Amino acid sequence: MKVCIAEKPSVAKEIADIVGAKNRHDGYYEGNGYQVTWTFGHLCTLKEPHEYTDSWKQWTLRSLPMIPTRFGIKLISDRGIEKQFGIIESLMSNAEVVINCGDAGQEGELIQRWVMQKAACKCPVYRLWISSLTEEAIREGFQNLKPQTEFDSLYFAGLSRAIGDWLLGMNATRLYTLKYGQNRQVLSIGRVQTPTLALIVNRQLEIEHFVPQPYWELKTLYRETTFAVTKGK
């Protein structure tokens, strides 16, 4: 049996229609030698600090920086995710071939790879790489499947991004919370959220400190018609 794993249910439905997997089951489609299942975006994430060592349970400055010797992944704690992962894991355990049908990009590669790692997938894996869900694009994609190993660099790029976010977020959040949280609140720091917050704060400060300045507009009168500059308003 060939097991296809899409990144979302709607994509799985499109793929199932093309490959002939017409029978709907709980969490997957089946038919014509295929089983088509799906994730809901991220099913797995990097482990929390305390899951690496008990010494990182307490938030202390002396424990920083926290740098795991080897990063590990875990299933996100959610009943729906746990159920769907169980279905995926069961399908993979009996698969002859797995086809990674994740979104064509760095994050799509990371999402599916983590699921396959967590499910201990041992059979050959191929990659469906498409940027459109038209029937023609899907059929062409299945005719040009490539070994997943050809996309290892894309996976490692996504993994590096995730690890970088973890190192910054976990360490900086604890640092700023301990130094400036005054034992009342967690000061969350992140690669994207903190610069975005800074943009908002800076803009608000500009508004609060705005001082009106006199300005002039250029106008001219020609044959009883007034012309004015509007560009840049």
Mark where each language-model region is.
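Intrinsically disordered, low-complexity regulatory segments
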Residues: M1-W166, M170, Y176, G232
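Prokaryote-biased recognition of long, low-complexity C-terminal linker/tail segments
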Residues: A6, R161, D165-G232
